[in-house]
Amino acid sequence: MAQWNQLQQLDTRYLEQLHQLYSDSFPMELRQFLAPWIESQDWAYAANKESHATLVFHNLLGEIDQQYSRFLQESNVLYQHNLRRIKQFLQSRYLEKPMEIARIVARCLWEESRLLQTAATAAQQGGQATHPTAAVVTEKQQMLEQHLQDVRKRVQDLEQKMKVVENLQDDFDFNYKTLKSQGDMQDLNGNNQSVTRQKMQQLEQMLTALDQMRRGIVSELAGLLSAMEYVQKMLADEELADWKRRQQIACIGGPPNICLDRLENWITSLAESQLQTRQQIKKLEELQQKVSYKGDPIVQHRPMLEERIVELFRNLMKSAFVVERQPCMPMHPDRPLVIKTGVQFTTKVRLLVKFPELNYQLKIKVCIDKDSGDVAALRGSRKFNILGTNTKVMNMEESNNGSLSAEFKHLTLREQRCGNGGRANCDASLIVTEELHLITFETEVYHQGLKIDLETHSLPVVVISNICQMPNAWASILWYNMLTNNPKNVNFFTKPPIGTWDQVAEVLSWQFSSTTKRGLSIEQLTTLAEKLLGPGVNYSGCQITWAKFCKENMAGKGFSFWVWLDNIIDLVKKYILALWNEGYIMGFISKERERAILSTKPPGTFLLRFSESSKEGGITFTWVEKDISGKTQIQSVEPYTKQQLNSMSFAEIIMGYKIMDATNILVSPLVYLYPDIPKEEAFGKYCRSESQEHSEATDSGSAAPYLKTKFICVTPTSFSNTIDLPMSPRTLDSLMQFGNSSEGAEANAGGQFESLTFDMELTQECASSPM
């Protein structure tokens, strides 16, 4: 099916976007009338080669004539009128600039294709995909769009005024040459001299009018360039800078509000207006060559106008070259900007000027620490080589939205070894996880006679040689992007700035919300603030140093705050993600707060919290119970670590957890998850059902079923030490458990025996918990 026919079948929201593609520059009626022929032409090639553009343009006029003949036979007066008007407009505007119409048509076809892809993606995702244009438009962005519309209108108005000036100049030139061809005016008779003087006066009046119009156009061009400069400043210094800051935030787990499509449309629109204005300035030079005179404003001002428009366009192209996706190892998508030597990483660059004629024209080269002066200034800084496919040509086919981009998928870093096989200098001023490096992308643009060198670079990356360095490397990325928007400060950690608790709290919450469905609550953050800053009432504005966050050990602990928290994040993602997403894990809570909220609850109420003493990350549960005298007791079990959770899910541990009292009776102390959720309701769906266990324990090829086993965690207690808990589960051998002889006979008759593994260590029943 033809592309145009597919577009007609889209929903209204997409058709509205289609209408926005077309204007008087390329009327939608013409797209409708000549749809098959238009789609059969190579407009992108024509936009880059003038001879082919001229041929296609004349063929376009011929197709219009043929369509007009068909409308004539159908007696369709309205279509005849519209088509005649369109042809006259195209001839007047593009006859001498066929590459311009080719570029406009090529862009429209690319935008149409992107629109179809967007609609198809939305359909595949059940209609849930939202188009970037549906994003919220701020008041500032509305003003920007109005300024862009004003620039486009002024460019078109100038185009019409240039034609008027050209026509007036042609009339003046014709009359002047006609008068001059009559011979030497001084030798004419009196009557002829009178006529000549009259014609001379007319020429003088025409020249005065021409001079006024030229001055008006020069003045309008100067004003237009100032308006373009203002819009460009808004785009580069505000919108693009805001996007880059949002990208920094997204890299460290913040909201992923980094779509570039709208910004690309704005920059492309401005670039098109600038190129059209440059052609208008060149047209002034042509007019000057035909007619010039003393005090000609074109002679005085055109060179400056040419210099300004070229400088504006160069700067716009340079700012439009961005890193769309920062370097990231595919195995660690949630931790970009940390790269391990010898491991592939990916990155993507994009040019936010979508000119189809640039497709497959720009070759991108990648290097690292190109401007290595700052890096080399740091004693002992490592140097690296980039291996893999480090050059690529930008194209529009690989991206889903037709943007001009290049994605590098097979890059690796290798450290340059010095003579002793180690770092360049053992007296390094920074540890390796504080070294920052820049990956640079370079290319050259040749467009309409201009050569523009483009260069952009990634955010600073940390290069590690062992995956155990990942936590500290990620802490460096967090601290850098939290506290600065300077994209090239590789010396940042020579004197790392101080952060506030408000900044740190937001970033810490992002570490959970970016990889799970739940961030940190105010109460959880307050507990973390207390661990970092000590007891306090209001932590807002409190300062936190880089060393306190990542390098110094916490009070009474042999590890830093960040190492402890990072292992908890890893624990959540790998072992207890579903429970965290449900909100069942209170996680970070002080012991005082824990005791306060549980002491008013009925026996059997429990909560889940993270261990404060486990460097590798641990989780425990605390419950309330009554002792023999009826006094309320708060008990905690020794934390479960990743090693234990590898063997048994935390939900199954909770569901099967028992206490063995002095009479060897097993009792479950866990009844209600705080505040009052029945244990089975909260955790039952995350455990295997009895029917699943039975089917797994039964061998269909065996004459008799296997004996069924069940692993549970048991804590032994005694009347003498009940109040000395927290209790520590330890491992004991598997035991065959029977209640009494009659129960055993009944079980044997049914062919089922239950084997229970108790987790206990009798020699350390009374060991105090490290929690």
Curated annotation (Swiss-Prot):
GO terms for biological process: cell surface receptor signaling pathway via JAK-STAT; defense response; eating behavior; eye photoreceptor cell differentiation; glucose homeostasis; growth hormone receptor signaling pathway via JAK-STAT; interleukin-6-mediated signaling pathway; leptin-mediated signaling pathway. Its main location: cytoplasm. It is found in: Cytoplasm; Nucleus. Pfam families: SH2, STAT_alpha, STAT_bind, STAT_int, STAT_linker. One of its GO terms (cellular component) is plasma membrane. It comes from the Eukaryota. Belongs to the transcription factor STAT family. This is Signal transducer and activator of transcription 3. It comes from Gallus gallus (Chicken). The gene is STAT3.
